[in-house]
């Protein structure tokens, strides 16, 4: 399927699974190349497991099946330098960024409420 974002490049955080993966895949199906970012490791203060590197790899595989390009990066959205590096890698590959989907997000619910 090719659609209204044909030839665009999307930078998607939280892309390893869940809504982030869903956005990345839909944008790819509609013609966008993807720069996919996720932390891919657990955070001590969060009481549930975060995405794993394998989850981000699966997102890449699914995007590639659409025929679109993807650059992945394990990066913590709380660290500007990590995001900058991921963005620069994506721009080096695709030349630009047209769309940003800031989907990374967690709920800090460790222990009893």
Feature-to-residue mapping (PLM):
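Canonical Rossmann dinucleotide-binding motif of NAD(H)/NADP(H)-dependent dehydrogenases/reductases
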Residues: 2-42
């Amino acid at each position: 399927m090719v659609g209204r974002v044909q030839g665009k490049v999307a930078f998607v955080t939280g892309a390893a699974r869940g809504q982030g993966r869903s956005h990345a895949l839909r944008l790819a199906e509609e013609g966008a190349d993807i720069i996919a970012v996720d932390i891919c490791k657990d955070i001590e203060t969060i009481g549930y497991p975060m995405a794993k590197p394998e989850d981000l790899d699966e997102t890449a595989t699914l995007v590639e099946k659409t025929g679109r390009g993807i650059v992945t990066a394990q990066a913590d959205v709380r660290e500007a330098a990590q995001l900058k590096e991921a963005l620069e890698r994506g721009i080096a590959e695709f030349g630009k960024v047209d769309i940003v989907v800031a989907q990374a997000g967690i709920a800090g619910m460790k222990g009893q409420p």
